[in-house]
Amino acid sequence: PYPIVEKSPSGKPALIVTTSGEAKFLGHLEVSFNKEGIPTSWNGEPVRLGKAGGSSEITKIINQAAEPVIKRNSTVVGTNLVKMRDGLDPCREGDCLSAMVTTDAMLDYARPKGAVVALINGGNFRAALPVGKITQGDIDNLLPFKDKVLLRKYTGKQLFEAVEHGVSDVDGIGPRMIQASGLRYTYSPTAPVGHRVRSVEVQDKNGKWKPLEYNKVYVAAVGAFLASGGDDHKALAGGIQISNSGLLVADVLKAYLKKKSPISQTPQPRISTVKEPSGE
């Protein structure tokens, strides 16, 4: 139904409308009110934009306003030669190229400041890193949120809890999944929630992987969303903040691409799964 009609706490009708997402529909609703401002009648339905006629005047205004945006978005910031699974869904399911390169960029930025790992949630990523030229517009599509890079201290226990929480959705996949650089982990998607992670390792300064130590303190570059407890990541909200760079994750990625392009080596796996014994 359009609109959905509910009752307000006072018993008056409340009209609720939605047009889904991705600008597919334009809402259209005509409402009549009485003297008390209470809706008395209504009529309308969402209009599919593909069928809506355009306005030449509005199109002209949009085109004029779009010129500087198009120029900015077409600016090339780097090049990628790697083809691998990537995009919104892959970044919520396991390793994905955009998250691997982004966390590498975060760690590259923060390592001189003492960081040994970089963490961000898979839900941050909304597009794939294109193969070929990478533009500013691609970066905006990839990381549309204004997440910032923070430097924080965490115990190994807190990092383990974050990884565990990251795979607590159905089948271990979802936006809360931890994407990382300098850290890798293995989990069982069929194990009980809270008991899925089988191992977590951290890479030392010589490139060797060592088991995460619960009582050791690690410095991490982490997205502000996670550090604020986003996606219910309580463990990451509990860290001790060292600094707030003020830099957007997207800007750190852009600087990294300018420095490291072309991206030509497929990153080593960081998220692995194991099957539970059948018990037969």
In which residue ranges do the predicted regions lie?
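Feature captures C-terminal
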Residues: 4-15, 25-28, 35-42, 96, ...
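Short beta-strand elements at the ligand-binding edges of bilobed clamshell
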Residues: 16-20
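Surface-exposed loop and adjacent secondary-structure segments within mature catalytic domains
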Residues: 21, 32-36, 43-49
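Short, exposed interaction patches on small structured surface elements
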Residues: 40-61
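Active-site neighborhoods of metal-dependent hydrolases
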Residues: 61-65, 124-125
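Acidic, glycine-rich low-complexity/disordered segments
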Residues: 63-78
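Glycine-rich phosphate/diphosphate-binding loops and the adjacent beta-loop-alpha structural elements
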Residues: 75-95
